[in-house]
Amino acid sequence: MILSDKDIIDYVTSKRIIIKPFNKDFVGPCSYDVTLGDEFIIYDDEVYDLSKELNYKRIKIKNSILVCPLNYNLTEEKINYFKEKYNVDYVVEGGVLGTTNEYIELPNDISAQYQGRSSLGRVFLTSHQTAGWIDAGFKGKITLEIVAFDKPVILYKNQRIGQLIFSKLLSPADVGYSERKTSKYAYQKSVMPSLIHLDNHKKD
């Protein structure tokens, strides 16, 4: 069962679902809009070796970031051109990880799905690749996987970036996500890189 606008407000008011900050204007008919934070991660590795910890750098914007498509062949000259013409804080190429401003806590009988906004999809920008599912019992901010597929796109801090759809489980989970010892992304307070190297890889 998907929660309606009335259900979402009721769950938040009764603190069964925590959304901080919460804006009643962001409640849709059966979703809640979330906004883009100011911290991002860019990977430094030539190859993603998923058995090892990945190298990355964190960046923080004051206002905006320009995301160029994959294999855009970005040069220093082009970066300086974009910064001067469009007054952006950073220019990046390829995938970049972002985060929501919103911190959420879900009870063990509510799961959620993150979906990018249709308006961003219409300029061929995605804000999640495969990680749209949020397990019951999750606590933390949502890490976003941002990729532009056509032209460079300027994103602004605090703009609406996507929405959460909440579903009620038939019965509560015995162990919620943030209670599991194997959960790698519980209580994340900002953007987090992939921690897949912590998985138990079976070697033949």
UniProtKB/Swiss-Prot annotation:
Keyword Zinc set for record: no
UniProt-recorded Gene Ontology molecular function terms: dCTP deaminase (dUMP-forming) activity; dCTP deaminase activity; nucleotide binding
Reactions catalysed, as given in the entry: dCTP + 2 H2O = dUMP + NH4(+) + diphosphate
Source organism superkingdom: Archaea
First-tier enzyme category under EC: hydrolase
Variation of activity with pH: Optimum pH is 7.5.
Site (Important for bifunctional activity): G132, W133
Signal peptide from the UniProt entry: none
Catalytic activity, EC: 3.5.4.30
Gene3D superfamilies: 2.70.40.10
InterPro entries for this protein: dCTP_deaminase, dUTPase-like_sf, dUTPase_trimeric
Family named by the database record: Belongs to the dCTP deaminase family.
Function, as annotated: Bifunctional enzyme that catalyzes both the deamination of dCTP to dUTP and the hydrolysis of dUTP to dUMP without releasing the toxic dUTP intermediate. It also acts as a dUTP diphosphatase with a lower affinity for dUTP than for dCTP.
Protein's UniProt name: dCTP deaminase, dUMP-forming
Source species: Methanocaldococcus jannaschii (strain ATCC 43067 / DSM 2661 / JAL-1 / JCM 10045 / NBRC 100440) (Methanococcus jannaschii)
Taxonomic lineage from the root: Archaea, Methanobacteriati, Methanobacteriota, Methanomada group, Methanococci
